[in-house]
Curated annotation (Swiss-Prot):
LRR repeats: 488-511, 512-534, 536-558, 560-581
Residues given in the record as ATP binding sites: G16, M17, I18, G19, S20, G21, K22, T23
Protein name per UniProt: Putative disease resistance protein At5g47280
Comment text on domains: The LRR repeats probably act as specificity determinant of pathogen recognition.
Keyword Repeat: yes
Matches recorded under Pfam families: NB-ARC
Keyword Nucleotide-binding: yes
Domain NB-ARC intervals: 2-51, 119-249
Keywords: ATP-binding, Leucine-rich repeat, Nucleotide-binding, Plant defense, Repeat
Entry GO MF terms: ADP binding; ATP binding
Source organism of the structure: Arabidopsis thaliana (Mouse-ear cress)
Similarity comment: Belongs to the disease resistance NB-LRR family.
Length: 623
């Protein structure tokens, strides 16, 4: 049962995104015979809402708990706690409001219904979106006044419409009402409009959006801006938190941790979902293993709010969905510079002739999504002198060849470059140095011999690079030694690269390196002894490196090392020098390897060793 059977005071929560059915669930609980029997019909249901009269609500709760309307000030008689009572507070917006409405009285259970997670997550029920069967029943109730598709009506049309609502009760009810008593021909048109990301009619869209927009008024301005930034990404995709962090940091002047806190706040308000990759269970130091997802309706609201006003004056210039060409309204507005700081493009294959001239003097973030084997980058990049974050993502089935790359001379202010499912362009001595690039991401790319060119001084091209991430690059056989010339590096992450066999022996040149992640590199056989000469190394992840059989004998020299993740390795022992790892505080290994750390555990006070079960399944990322 949801409610406690003892007589202690208790607070529990119901949480979920706007329109998910939280209030309906709470009202059903208030009417439920078993619940009412448990509380002897002593159930109070109050709606708090956005601008509550807290004094009046508090008075109503006090009168309910005392059983009469006599005033007791702030004190309540001892007899109050002798009976069980249920107080349901619906639509609570802030923790401050909740605190003023709470009475810590034995026997009293308070059920808090809120979009945000205001109650301990361990006692909060998260309302899930509806499965197909329940979604269809709810939709049919609204569209046909019955719980099933009427005889003779197209079940295929109903299924398509229900699918577009993605299980959100609010959307299902509004959409059903807009199609009620309409002929099948109208439904067919509605399905076509929905498939294009358009509303069935203005009423359908406005009713859903109005309810969601109202909840955004509680956000502080910066958090609301970050919510609107989510519209820059394609619907239905997992967004790596690293991409979002880089974006928010640059355009909102936030530190990494503060940007992540904003995402957590949005997640707590059910305006997005944070998903942690289950393969990373150790205490890592990167956000790369976390992804963000967002319900399509929430993304549509962000786009709706963003795409108001004159095109050239918008802070964000976003394409809601993939199109063969750029929107015609963009071309009609290109007679003056665009005001956008964030630009997001989503197309198919583009040739040089498909682009038209655009001027983005204020653009700091450019996101290019496409689906093609060949892609010509937009020529107007050459004029984006303020660009800080550049994201290129190919959603096609094979890596694309990029044309008009490397990056033009005007992008020397670039801080972060994300390349996904493309052939990494070959570096050349004529390439203009990216003097301010700090972070480079190569995801599902063909690296070819891009970095392995001794005639090129990579450190000159990337003089300030601090982080390099290489993930799912199956043609990477070894990390080129030239990369070790980038002495500013403090993080190297090589993950899910099935063919890498060794690291360069001159890795000791990376005197600033703090993080070395080598997750799921099954052919990596050893670590170079030079790793023991890294004076600032804090974190090493060698988990799921199935062929790695030993650690360097002098690993104990790395006195700064704090965390090691070595799940699913083939290590048969730990070097005796490991007892000198005086800063080590956290080790993750599989259960059979616990005995290896016994001596180290005795020698290093406070060392925590976490054992996990064996598991490994190297799969390509889902689309």
């Amino acid at each position: 049962m949801l409610f406690n059977l003892n007589d202690e005071a208790r607070i529990i929560g119901i949480s979920g995104m706007i329109g998910s059915g939280k209030t309906i669930l709470a009202k059903e609980l208030a009417r439920d015979e078993e619940v009412r029997g448990h509380f002897a019909n002593r159930v109070l249901f109050l709606t708090v809402s956005q601008s509550p009269n807290l004094e009046e609500l508090r008075s109503l709760i006090r009168d309910f708990l005392t059983g009469h309307e006599a005033g007791f000030g702030t004190a309540l008689p001892e007899s109050v706690g002798h009976t069980r009572k249920l107080v349901i507070l619906d639509d609570v917006r802030t923790r401050e409001s909740l605190d003023q409405l709470m009475f810590n009285i034995p026997g009293t259970t308070t059920l808090v219904v809120s979009q945000s997670k205001l109650v301990d997550p361990r006692t909060t029920y998260d309302v899930e979106l509806l499965n197909e069967h329940d979604a269809t029943s709810l939709f049919c109730l609204s569209a046909f006044n019955q719980k099933s598709v009427p005889s003779g009506f197209s079940k295929s049309l109903v299924k398509q419409v229900v699918g577009e609502s993605k299980g959100l009760p609010l959307s299902l009810k509004v959409l059903g009402a807009s199609l009620n008593d309409r002929p099948e021909t109208y439904w067919a048109i509605a399905v076509e409009r929905l498939s294009r990301g358009e509303p069935v009619d203005e009423t359908h869209e406005s009713k859903v959006f109005a309810q969601i927009e109202a909840t955004l008024e509680n956000l502080d301005p910066k958090t609301k801006e970050c919510f609107l930034d989510m519209g820059a990404f394609p619907e239905g995709k997992k967004i790596p938190v690293d991409v979002l962090i880089n974006m928010l940091v640059k355009i909102h002047d936030l530190e990494d941790a503060a940007a992540f806190d904003v995402l957590v706040d949005l997640a707590n308000r059910n305006l997005l979902t944070l998903v942690k990759d289950p393969t990373f269970v150790a205490m890592g130091t990167s956000y790369y293993d976390i992804f963000v997802t967002q319900h399509d309706v929430l993304r549509d609201v962000a786009l709706h709010l963003t795409n108001r006003g004159k095109v050239s004056r918008r802070d964000r210039l976003l394409m809601p969905k993939r199109e063969t060409m750029l929107p015609s309204e963009w071309e009609r507005s290109n007679d003056e510079p665009y005001n956008a700081r964030v630009v997001s493009i989503h197309t198919g294959e583009m040739t040089e002739m498909d682009w038209f001239d655009m001027d983005f003097p204020k653009a700091e973030v450019l996101i290019v999504n496409f689906s093609s084997d060949n892609y010509v980058l937009p020529p107007f990049i050459a004029k984006m002198g303020m660009l800080r974050v550049f994201v290129i993502i190919n959603n096609g089935t094979s890596p694309a060849h990029l044309h008009d790359f490397p990056i033009p001379t005007s992008l020397t202010n670039l801080r972060s470059l994300w390349l996904e499912r493309v052939h990494v362009p070959e570096l050349s001595s004529s390439m203009i140095p990216l003097k301010n690039l700090h972070k480079l991401y190569l995801i599902i790319c063909k690296i070819n011999n891009s970095f392995d060119q001794t005639a090129i001084d990579i450190a000159q091209i990337f003089p300030k690079l601090t982080d390099i991430t290489i993930d799912y690059c199956d043609d990477l056989a070894e990390l080129p030694s030239t990369i070790c010339g980038i002495t500013s590096l403090n993080s190297i992450s090589i993950t899910n690269c099935p063919n890498i066999k060794e690291l360069p022996k001159n890795i000791s040149k990376l005197q600033a390196l703090q993080l070395l992640r080598l997750y799921a590199c099954p052919e990596l056989k050893s670590l170079p002894v030079e790793i023991c000469e890294l004076p600032r190394l804090v974190y090493v992840d060698i988990s799921h490196c199935l062929s790695l059989s030993s650690l360097p004998e002098k690993i104990g020299n790395v006195r700064t090392l704090e965390k090691i993740d070595m799940r699913e390795c083939s290590l048969s022992s730990i070097p005796s020098s490991a007892v000198s790892l005086t800063s080590l505080c956290y080790v993750t290994c599989y259960r059979e390897a616990l005995w290896m750390w016994k001596e180290v555990e005795k020698a290093v006070p406070g060392l925590r060793i976490e054992a996990t079960e064996k598991w490994f399944n190297m799969t390509w990322p889902d689309e």
